[in-house]
From Swiss-Prot:
This is Polyadenylate-binding protein-interacting protein 2B. Inhibits translation of capped and polyadenylated mRNAs by displacing PABPC1 from the poly(A) tail. Interacts (via central acidic portion and C-terminus) with PABPC1 (via the second and third RRM domains and the C-terminus). It comes from the Eukaryota. It comes from Mus musculus (Mouse). Belongs to the PAIP2 family. One of its GO terms (biological process) is negative regulation of translational initiation. Residues 27-40 have a biased composition (Basic and acidic residues). Residues 15-25 have a biased composition (Polar residues). Keywords: Repressor, Translation regulation, Ubl conjugation.
Amino acid sequence: MTTLNTGSARISIMNGSSVASTSPSVKCKEDQGLNGHEEKENPFAEYMWMENEEDFNRQVEEELQEQDFLDRCFQEMLDEEDQDWFIPARDLPQAVGHLQQQLNGLSVGDSHESEDILSKSNLNPDAKEFVPGVKY
């Protein structure tokens, strides 16, 4: 297939027959590069990063390290905030165990001991109840 450009018309000759095209905005595949790029455009532009592959790798690695650092910072902030809040599932079992130990140490006294305390008391049983700020 041979293509001839004559001003605004393009003529394609195929096996002795000719087809005329007058639309200047439509370009045929021969005017474009192998993968759809125009002749003026570099067909290898999408692969130019490989020219400086070490710089590209370093940049990507820095971005990954930065993202990892940010993730660790956020996790540390969340952990610190978690410690400041009361979470029953985490905090209650320890507190309940401590209270259970304290309750086990208590004993119920019999009524004779309370009578002994009252008989040894120096307080006046007929005195009025003390109320702070009230003068009698």
